[in-house]
Amino acid sequence: MSLSPRLYTQVSRLPRELLTACSITLATRSFSVLHRPAPNYPGHVPLTSIERGGLAVGSAVMAFFNPYRADLIAACGEATATPYFIYRLRDAMLSSPTGRRILRDRPRISSKTLSMPRLRALPPNTVGRCYAEWLDREGVSPDTRDSVKYIDDEECAYVMQRYRECHDFYHAITGLPIVREGEVALKAFEFANTLLPMTGLSMFAVMSLKPAERRRFFTIYAPWAFANGLKAEEVINVYWEEQLERSVEELREELGIEKPLDLRDIRRMEKERKKAQKAT
């Protein structure tokens, strides 16, 4: 079926990950872009149920084969969070005085809202210093998080955005690196704590790990992730901007999070052991 010039123009403006993930849907039914409801907030892309399902399946499959495509992971997270899970997370924030303040204030986390030089100058062992050092060590920036597009409720869209922008703080206080093994461990913790389906689906990436990494995940990091994720306070309710000068150990204790074994040290010692074996 050929597209009229007007319809082609409308379709071409849709986000790339939606067009890619929903290619089967587009091939089997008339695309309803001309009748799409008005967006509920800037950047919002309303989806039908079929489009949402196509986006969820397509982005999940492609993200499994290319886990470094952050846009696909973000799209999968949004498509699978509704209708129930993102509302549960929003309600968890509404049930907390701090969560309600976050929803009222709508803070954003980026290099524009956080002064990285100031964080680097904070005393050692503070949350802000720990966060800045983790970003520097891993070579990442707080400005890399995609904006939410596919969640219809404007308040829930902010909840997803907040979760997304706080992800690096979870890395920082647990010490888990951004290597695939560390990401899988953190996603397991997030799943136990937030119940967002995308975090659970991300654990299938354990199948792509090396045998030694899989053993470490199942014997060390999965037990840590589920035990701590279930017993810890809801991490979505942490007002990180107000915790920057606190002791990171004190905050972990308050949240009920035990720091896992240092994955970078384990990987380094494993590499040295293999190197020594080859030398002999």
Curated annotation (Swiss-Prot):
Taxon lineage:
Eukaryota, Fungi, Dikarya, Ascomycota, Pezizomycotina
Q: What is its EC number?
A: 4.1.1.130
**Positions bound to Zn(2+):** 167-168, 171, 183
Name of the gene:
coq4
- Coiled-coil intervals, chain numbering: none
User: Topology versus the membrane, per the UniProt entry?
Assistant: Peripheral membrane protein
What PANTHER family has UniProt attached to this entry? UBIQUINONE BIOSYNTHESIS PROTEIN, UBIQUINONE BIOSYNTHESIS PROTEIN COQ4 HOMOLOG, MITOCHONDRIAL
HAMAP family recorded: Coq4
Q: In which pathway does it act?
A: Cofactor biosynthesis; ubiquinone biosynthesis
Q: List the disulfide bonds.
A: none
Q: What is the species of this protein?
A: Botryotinia fuckeliana (strain B05.10)
The protein's name in its UniProt record: Ubiquinone biosynthesis protein coq4, mitochondrial
Cofactor(s) listed in the protein's UniProt record: Zn(2+)
